[in-house]
Amino acid sequence: MTTQPSKQLETFENPIQTRDYRIHMEIPEFTCLCPKTGQPDFARLTLDYIPDKKCIELKSLKLYIWSYRNEGTFHEAVTNQILDDLVIAMKPRFIRLTSKFYVRGGIFTNVVAEHRKKGWHPQPPVFLESFDEQFNTRS
């Protein structure tokens, strides 16, 4: 059982390479240190990506995220570094990382970074009518 943080991201083969589909992940407990004060910064990371040939392995992602816990870094830098490392590991068709940092000095900071694979174009969205919430009994 691994009990140490790691910068090593692992991947596995995308089981459905013929289709664009979105993988959505929420990482509610990201921490790093403010490079100016050494105080902890906390953020909720949201990762959305459309894989190409590889997907990110979750345990390695957890250990990778953990590796920033004692690292001093600016919000903008860490968001872009994480995105760059994920792009190198997976080479996805599309990836977006949103970092929502908790209040610091009365200011909330949100950083959004994204990458599109050269030559990839998303399919146009399909909007479907919503249904009312369903219950197991009819009224």
From Swiss-Prot:
One of its GO terms (biological process) is queuosine biosynthetic process. It is found in: Cytoplasm. Pfam families: QueF. The keyword Manganese does not apply. It is an enzyme of class 1 (oxidoreductase). The active site is at residues 34, 41. SUPFAM superfamilies: Tetrahydrobiopterin biosynthesis enzymes-like. It comes from the Bacteria. Pathway: tRNA modification; tRNA-queuosine biosynthesis. GO terms for molecular function: preQ1 synthase activity. Its EC number is 1.7.1.13. InterPro entries: GTP-CH-I_C/QueF, NADPH_dep_7-cyano-7-deazaG_red, QueF, QueF_type1. It catalyses: 7-aminomethyl-7-carbaguanine + 2 NADP(+) = 7-cyano-7-deazaguanine + 2 NADPH + 3 H(+). GO terms for cellular component: cytoplasm. Keywords: Cytoplasm, NADP, Oxidoreductase, Queuosine biosynthesis. Catalyzes the NADPH-dependent reduction of 7-cyano-7-deazaguanine (preQ0) to 7-aminomethyl-7-deazaguanine (preQ1). This is NADPH-dependent 7-cyano-7-deazaguanine reductase. It comes from Nitrosomonas eutropha (strain DSM 101675 / C91 / Nm57).
